[in-house]
Amino acid sequence: MSSGALLPKPQMRGLLAKRLRVHIVGAFVVALGVAAAYKFGVAEPRKKAYADFYRNYDSMKDFEEMRQAGVFQSAK
Protein backbone atom coordinates (compact mmCIF):
# COMPACT_ATOMS: atom_id res chain seq x y z
CA MET A 1 0.00 0.00 0.00
CA SER A 2 1.47 3.36 -0.97
CA SER A 3 1.32 6.48 1.19
CA GLY A 4 -0.58 8.28 -1.58
CA ALA A 5 -3.61 6.11 -1.02
CA LEU A 6 -3.75 6.85 2.70
CA LEU A 7 -3.91 10.64 2.59
CA PRO A 8 -6.21 12.71 0.38
CA LYS A 9 -4.55 15.18 -1.93
CA PRO A 10 -4.34 18.71 -0.49
CA GLN A 11 -6.26 21.48 -2.18
CA MET A 12 -3.77 23.63 -4.06
CA ARG A 13 -6.03 26.00 -5.97
CA GLY A 14 -8.19 28.79 -4.58
CA LEU A 15 -6.64 28.84 -1.10
CA LEU A 16 -6.20 32.61 -1.05
CA ALA A 17 -9.68 33.25 -2.46
CA LYS A 18 -11.26 30.99 0.15
CA ARG A 19 -9.29 32.59 2.98
CA LEU A 20 -10.12 36.12 1.78
CA ARG A 21 -13.81 35.26 1.46
CA VAL A 22 -13.92 34.05 5.07
CA HIS A 23 -11.99 37.03 6.41
CA ILE A 24 -13.97 39.60 4.43
CA VAL A 25 -17.21 38.25 5.88
CA GLY A 26 -15.68 38.35 9.37
CA ALA A 27 -14.42 41.90 8.88
CA PHE A 28 -17.84 43.01 7.64
CA VAL A 29 -19.54 41.50 10.69
CA VAL A 30 -17.04 43.13 13.06
CA ALA A 31 -17.43 46.51 11.31
CA LEU A 32 -21.22 46.34 11.62
CA GLY A 33 -20.88 45.44 15.30
CA VAL A 34 -18.56 48.36 16.00
CA ALA A 35 -20.79 50.77 14.09
CA ALA A 36 -23.87 49.63 16.01
CA ALA A 37 -22.02 49.84 19.33
CA TYR A 38 -20.87 53.39 18.56
CA LYS A 39 -24.33 54.47 17.41
CA PHE A 40 -26.17 53.14 20.44
CA GLY A 41 -23.36 53.60 22.98
CA VAL A 42 -22.12 57.07 22.03
CA ALA A 43 -24.14 58.88 19.36
CA GLU A 44 -27.66 58.28 20.67
CA PRO A 45 -26.85 59.25 24.30
CA ARG A 46 -25.03 62.35 23.05
CA LYS A 47 -27.97 63.32 20.84
CA LYS A 48 -30.35 62.83 23.78
CA ALA A 49 -28.15 64.93 26.07
CA TYR A 50 -28.08 67.79 23.54
CA ALA A 51 -31.86 67.58 23.10
CA ASP A 52 -32.39 67.63 26.89
CA PHE A 53 -30.06 70.61 27.29
CA TYR A 54 -31.64 72.73 24.55
CA ARG A 55 -35.19 71.82 25.61
CA ASN A 56 -34.73 73.85 28.82
CA TYR A 57 -32.06 76.32 27.66
CA ASP A 58 -32.84 80.02 27.95
CA SER A 59 -30.26 81.94 25.94
CA MET A 60 -31.40 85.36 27.17
CA LYS A 61 -31.05 84.29 30.81
CA ASP A 62 -27.55 82.99 30.07
CA PHE A 63 -26.69 86.24 28.27
CA GLU A 64 -27.93 88.35 31.20
CA GLU A 65 -25.87 86.31 33.68
CA MET A 66 -22.73 86.77 31.57
CA ARG A 67 -23.46 90.49 31.08
CA GLN A 68 -23.89 91.03 34.83
CA ALA A 69 -20.68 89.11 35.49
CA GLY A 70 -18.82 91.54 33.20
CA VAL A 71 -17.85 89.04 30.52
CA PHE A 72 -18.75 91.39 27.67
CA GLN A 73 -16.99 94.70 27.17
CA SER A 74 -19.53 96.19 24.76
CA ALA A 75 -22.78 95.26 26.58
CA LYS A 76 -23.19 97.30 29.77
From Swiss-Prot:
One of its GO terms (cellular component) is respiratory chain complex IV. Component of the cytochrome c oxidase (complex IV, CIV), a multisubunit enzyme composed of 14 subunits. The complex is composed of a catalytic core of 3 subunits MT-CO1, MT-CO2 and MT-CO3, encoded in the mitochondrial DNA, and 11 supernumerary subunits COX4I, COX5A, COX5B, COX6A, COX6B, COX6C, COX7A, COX7B, COX7C, COX8 and NDUFA4, which are encoded in the nuclear genome. Coiled coil: none annotated. Component of the cytochrome c oxidase, the last enzyme in the mitochondrial electron transport chain which drives oxidative phosphorylation. The respiratory chain contains 3 multisubunit complexes succinate dehydrogenase (complex II, CII), ubiquinol-cytochrome c oxidoreductase (cytochrome b-c1 complex, complex III, CIII) and cytochrome c oxidase (complex IV, CIV), that cooperate to transfer electrons derived from NADH and succinate to molecular oxygen, creating an electrochemical gradient over the inner membrane that drives transmembrane transport and the ATP synthase. Gene3D superfamilies: Mitochondrial cytochrome c oxidase subunit VIc/VIIs. Pathway: Energy metabolism; oxidative phosphorylation. Residues 4-14 are mitochondrial matrix. The chain crosses the membrane at residues 15-55. It is a single-pass membrane protein. The modification Phosphoserine is found at S74. GO terms for biological process: oxidative phosphorylation. This is Cytochrome c oxidase subunit 6C-2. Residues 56-76 are mitochondrial intermembrane. Belongs to the cytochrome c oxidase subunit 6c family. PANTHER family: CYTOCHROME C OXIDASE SUBUNIT 6C (PTHR48416:SF1). It is found in: Mitochondrion inner membrane. SUPFAM superfamilies: Mitochondrial cytochrome c oxidase subunit VIc. Keywords: Membrane, Mitochondrion, Mitochondrion inner membrane, Phosphoprotein, Transmembrane, Transmembrane helix. The keyword Mitochondrion applies. The keyword DNA-binding does not apply.
